[in-house]
A protein has these predicted regions:
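Bacterial N-terminal signal peptides that target proteins for export
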Residues: 1-8
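Beta-propeller folds
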Residues: 8-9, 19-286
């Protein structure tokens, strides 16, 4: 039988004490290193190469990853690959979840929860917006005076967003007689909006819904006609200007202008005195 010397026992005791007295931050560091090492074992997906020849302006090149494009976003092979990429990212970042949560809460804590915009007069009313508490979306209001003594809510996006994973509003625009308001809503995050018309005197929506638009209208002075821009379903480029009369189906709308040059964006605006409507174009290459 082996006999342990006093020296050996003393050395063992010191080693145990040394291990027990490690600083907390050092122990935490080692834990992170272990978790990181586990994350590294995740295998990154490798996209296959499928040569695709493309010729533009007389120049031919090979795009090995062209197969990853699917404008309809339905190809199972592409979806499976993207899911594998996401799974790999989740695995590699798993050890940072607590840190992510901590950073998120810290950043939220810096946000001013209650905020109001400066009222701006348009027609007979002063329009403004506000955010309150933990609400994710804006509430839009109007009042007959700058101080907001008779302030009324004309659109509460928090209410509209209920039941949707994503929701965005754009292009709020009130009719010249201050009675109707048009706005666009997007529930899929494609920046393609369905335009709604709200009667501000009753708070109810009209039956009119204009689909596939850029999200805003320009009102004609008759308070019953709106002009809007329709987007291409694949390129998402706004290129057609339509005229819609309230109370009629969108299929009856009249095409006013169509831009065939895909290098230009199409926009609309109204003159300051309200007498004219402009159709304009812009391009990053022009």
């Amino acid at each position: 039988m082996m006999t342990r010397t006093p020296f050996a026992l003393a050395a063992l005791s010191l080693a145990i004490l040394s291990g027990c007295n490690k600083a907390p931050e050092e122990t935490q560091k080692n834990t992170v290193q272990v978790e990181s090492a586990q994350a590294v074992t995740a295998v990154a997906p490798i996209a296959k190469k499928v040569p695709h020849e493309m010729t533009i302006h007389g120049d031919t090149r090979i795009d090995n990853y062209y197969w990853l494009r699917d404008d309809e976003r339905k190809a199972p092979e592409i979806i499976n690959y993207l899911e594998a990429e996401n799974a790999y990212s989740d695995a590699m970042l798993a050890h940072t979840k607590k840190l992510q949560s901590s950073l998120f809460e810290e950043l939220k804590g810096r946000i001013q929860k209650d905020d109001d915009s400066v009222p701006v007069k348009d027609g007979q009313y002063y329009y403004s917006s506000q955010t309150r508490g933990d609400n994710e979306y804006t509430t839009y209001l109007r009042s007959s005076d700058f101080t907001g003594t008779d302030q009324e809510v004309i659109l509460d996006v928090n209410e509209l967003a209920k039941g949707h994973d994503y929701f965005a509003v754009s292009g709020l625009n009130v009719s010249p007689n201050d009675n109707l308001m048009a706005y666009g809503e997007d529930t899929v995050s494609r920046r393609v909006y369905n335009i709604k018309i709200k009667d501000l005197s009753t708070g109810k929506l009209l039956d009119d819904t204009l689909e596939g638009t850029s999200g805003y209208v320009v009102w004609a002075n008759d308070n019953k006609t709106v002009y809007y821009i329709k987007k291409d379903a694949q390129t998402l480029l706004g290129y057609q200007v339509y005229r819609h009369t309230l109370g009629t189906p969108q299929s009856d709308d009249e095409l006013v202008y169509e831009e065939t040059d895909t290098s230009y964006y199409t926009g609309m605006s109204k003159s300051k005195d309200g007498s004219e409507i402009y159709i304009w174009h812009s391009s990053t290459d022009a």
